[in-house]
Amino acid sequence: MTKTEHRCGWVALLGPPNAGKSTLLNSALGHKVAIVTPRAQTTRNQIVGILSEPDAQVIFMDTPGIHQQRGRMNKILLQTAWQSMHSADVILVMLDADLYIKKPDFLENDVKPLMDAVAAEERPVIVAVNKVDLFRDKSKMLPLFIELQKLWPKAEVFPVSALKRDGLPELVKLVKSKLPVAPALYPEDQLSTLPVRFMAAEIVREKLFLALRQELPYSVAVEIEKWDEEEGRDLVTIHAVIYVGRPSHKSMVIGKAGATIKDIGTKARVDIQDLLEKKVHLELWVKVREGWTEDVGFLRSLGLADE
């Protein structure tokens, strides 16, 4: 790459659920633009994160995890991931190295369908094998690397720890080298294309999953109903509604004497204040909306389905 060449392009982050795509995006940017929880399928929308460096601008598209689950919403999430792949200049596949050891059918059931689809695309493919920091004996990963290279010889396989940033600078350098020569598309100080209202709703959803872990069913959504910024005042008033699928889920989110939702609101408010760099007054309500994951009109209102 010469000094006069500036590269810019779109990079689709694809992979099974919980592979570490959102963690890698946040680590690469040095800022949090995608929520991260231990729950599979935390990411529902295409999350765009922009890394601007003197020689390149990398526009990452974090996507929902590739999975085999049924249902209208899951179908929409898969469409989002595939659309990102089709529009990308570079495809970056994230795999969880730990699952190769723990799940005997990992390659056949989780990886092969994804990589076969990716291989049909005529663009550079990089496979980032994530969570290598979990292996004291790195030789245990060698069979995975050999199998991946044998099955998809055109893909470049790269070890990385998104959480600890091991190998991340080298991975970013490799990604940049695959981008087309082009000027930057966004200002160098812009980190994302996401509206702040969307990011605030995502923060609330993250705190929900972190507070309730596996207890809370997947059918939960957050919608911002009110957003007021008074001119001349360093204060934003936000009213957010948490939608759940059943009355029992509502009780779970509220908690005993409202303790759970109060804790969720407090933690979300802190992060939203950091995002907006303003004081925030956040109020949360919980509403039951049965069958919302199959309601296309409601999914559209949440930005999860095309008009």
UniProtKB/Swiss-Prot annotation:
Region annotation G5: where it falls in the sequence: 160-162
Region (G4): 130-133
Region listing for G2, in residue ranges: 41-45
Keywords from the UniProt entry: Cell inner membrane, Cell membrane, Cytoplasm, GTP-binding, Membrane, Nucleotide-binding, Ribosome biogenesis, RNA-binding, rRNA-binding
Membrane protein topology class: Peripheral membrane protein
GO molecular function: GTP binding; GTPase activity; ribosomal small subunit binding; small ribosomal subunit rRNA binding
Subcellular location: Cytoplasm; Cell inner membrane
Record-annotated KH type-2 domain positions: 212-290
One example of a Gene Ontology biological process annotation: ribosomal small subunit assembly
Chain segments carrying region G1: 15-22
Principal localisation: cytoplasm
InterPro entries according to UniProt: G_ERA_dom, GTP-bd, GTPase_Era-like, KH_dom-like_a/b, KH_dom_type_2, KH_sf_prok-type, P-loop_NTPase, Small_GTP-bd
Spans annotated as G3: 62-65
Pfam families per UniProt: KH_2 (PF07650), MMR_HSR1 (PF01926)
GO cellular component terms given for this protein: cytosol; plasma membrane
Protein origin, superkingdom: Bacteria
Residues binding GTP: 15-22, 62-66, 130-133
Domain Era-type G: 7-181
Assembly mode: Monomer.
Function: An essential GTPase that binds both GDP and GTP, with rapid nucleotide exchange. Plays a role in 16S rRNA processing and 30S ribosomal subunit biogenesis and possibly also in cell cycle regulation and energy metabolism.
HAMAP family per the UniProt record, alphabetical: GTPase_Era
Protein family membership: Belongs to the TRAFAC class TrmE-Era-EngA-EngB-Septin-like GTPase superfamily. Era GTPase family.
NCBIfam families: era, PRK00089.1, small_GTP
Protein name listed in UniProt: GTPase Era
Source organism: Nitratidesulfovibrio vulgaris (strain DSM 19637 / Miyazaki F)
Gene encoding the protein: era
